[in-house]
Amino acid sequence: MSGSVITGLYFNKVEGADNGSLKMGGMGELPDDPHLMLTAREDLGNGWYTGAQLQNRFYPDSGTFRSNGYLFDAQSRLFVGNDQIEFSFGRMAGLTVAGRPYSVYGKTNANMTFASLGGIAPANIMFQPGDLSNAIAFSTNAQSGLFVRGVYSNGDSVNGTDTETTEDWSDRRHVAQFSTGWTGDHLKTAVVYSFEMPGNVKNADGTRPGERKKNTHAVHLIASYDFGGPAVSGILYASQNDWRIGPVNDLSAIVGGSDVVSNSEEGLDNL
């Protein structure tokens, strides 16, 4: 059992504003989110192990859960592996996030804020799929040298019917990410390919919520270099039909309202 209760102060000033404000650090704005984590691990012999991990994030000022409807919103996964590779099944984050379990930003030291500060942290301004249910993931376990990671989720929507019809499957949100890279003593690099098929589950009356959205394709090129104290990192990002900026599908707040997004088949193209 492990966990943390973290809070702090930070100064925030919007560009063009006359004054800034001093605020308490909230969820995603600290080096680690306040959380409780339960981990169990069993040695199977011959270098193999298996286990389970449950993690819940909460607000330290009120004690309330971060996500309504989830007892363990951050992680609820089973894993099995050895010294070379690990496989996970359940609910977990994708690869382009700040935290556990398979963050490529963390692996390459590319997230210098160690949090999700708005406008600064890469996980908050480029594609990341959020926490994924019904996910399968893998990661090689080498501490240095070549690494490979991947994750796939067939959707976490609770809308629509429970029958596994072809339409139900095709209308659920699907996410896949694949990454490979190299970590050395000083230089660390990685490339991440991301795919998202936006969900289009029917409303209760049988109608669709809007136009069918085109699939998102995105690529991150990531690198960092440690000079033995000071370090520098950089990320090049390109995407086609992006529907989210960070973990939230909130493109409507950027391009001029929900009607614009709902009636469009194409998302943003970024470079």
PLM feature spans:
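Flexible, surface-exposed loop regions and adjacent strand-edge segments
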Residues: N19-G20, N68-L71, Y105-A110, T207-P209, ...
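Outer membrane beta-barrel
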Residues: M1-F11, K23-S157, R172, G181-K188
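Outer-membrane beta-barrel domain signature
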Residues: K23-M27, D61-S67, P122-P129, G160-W169, ...
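Gram-negative outer-membrane beta-barrel proteins
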Residues: L9-N19, F58-T64, L95-G99, D156-D162, ...
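Detector for outer-membrane/organellar transmembrane beta-barrel domains
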Residues: D171-R173, Q177-L271
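Glutamate identity and glutamate-enriched acidic tracts
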Residues: E15, E29, E42, E86, ...
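Flexible, solvent-exposed coil segments and beta strand-coil junctions
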Residues: V14-A17, A115-G118, D156, L251-S258
